Amino acid sequence: MKIVVTGTRGIPNVMGGVETHCEELFPRIASFGEDVTLIRRASYVNDGLTEWKGVKLVDIATPKKKSFEAIVHTFRAINKAKSLGAEVLHVHAIGPALLVPYARLLGMKVVFTHHGPDYDRDKWGMAAKMILKLGERMGCMFANEVIVISDVIKNLIARKYGRTEHVHLIYNGVPSPEICDYPEYFEELGIEKGKYILGMCRFVPEKNLHHLVEAYTSLIRNEELGMRNCKLVLAGDTDFEDEYSRGLKEMARKNGVVLTGFIKGRKLHSLLTNCRCYCLPSSHEGLPIALLEAMSYKVPVVVSDIPANLEVGLPKEDYFPCGDVKALAEKLQDVVSKPLQPVDYYMGKYYWDKIAKQVDEVYQSLRH
């Protein structure tokens, strides 16, 4: 089956939850014998690749503008998919889903994966939020098959659009952990094993990393808590440097926070292997891949109590009220004060091999 994928910036090694999802999923789909082409945004990749792990890669130039790059790229990608003879177009995220009806008019069968209500993100203005909501509507009403990554999203589209048929709950996955040390990298960062809190995500407002920095700062300033030897490491960056990301970085540097930039591979694996705990204080998520990845390393986690995080099913003591910096600080202090022990989380729903088979079954249903 000829499958063309759009709605992602690209793979491999491109920052973002949808990008991580596609990087894990589509090589597995290709290994089943499917003919998979993924269309990338040229401004995010410079590796010259035309194929990666069995997935064909096509780069299309798109203006790198936050407000309209996704829709321009999707329009061009749909036209390219038609010229490639795509039997199935797989569209990721609600912004690109705005053009699902166009793809249907061109005769393609469409699978739409809803990764979360992006219009809830703080970074979007009113006009962008309206377009994203329209994209969600178009995807849910006109796609042949809809994949949702959480029960929260499944219930949302049933309530808003009455879409209950041809809807498939298929979770995000997490790869097997790569346990490793990287002494030279730790020396470069000025950190020690087991003596740092890790925040790992994009530097955008809804991730609430400023709350994490505020909570950490309040702890290290209180000498009675004995937190001065514990560092805070923020691994990540932003696609579009803006007032928020610049302010966050400046705030972090002033308070001794370690900034790694966007990292993958051994550097990231070593940070996950050796952190004291992982923290995700966000106000918006679909199903957080970064949290699942931290859980796979059996490290303690502290996360906000938003619906997407609650759906992961962590113990009650791992959650704090979203936006409550004092409660976050108390949770971090409590975790750091306890002896470090590996935590066995239930990860059965999040195996990528299982997830890939579920997605391929959706494709096969379109043969009929």
Features from the language model and the residues they span:
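A short, active-site helix/loop in glycosyltransferases that binds the activated sugar's phosphate group
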Residues: C140-V167, V174-S176
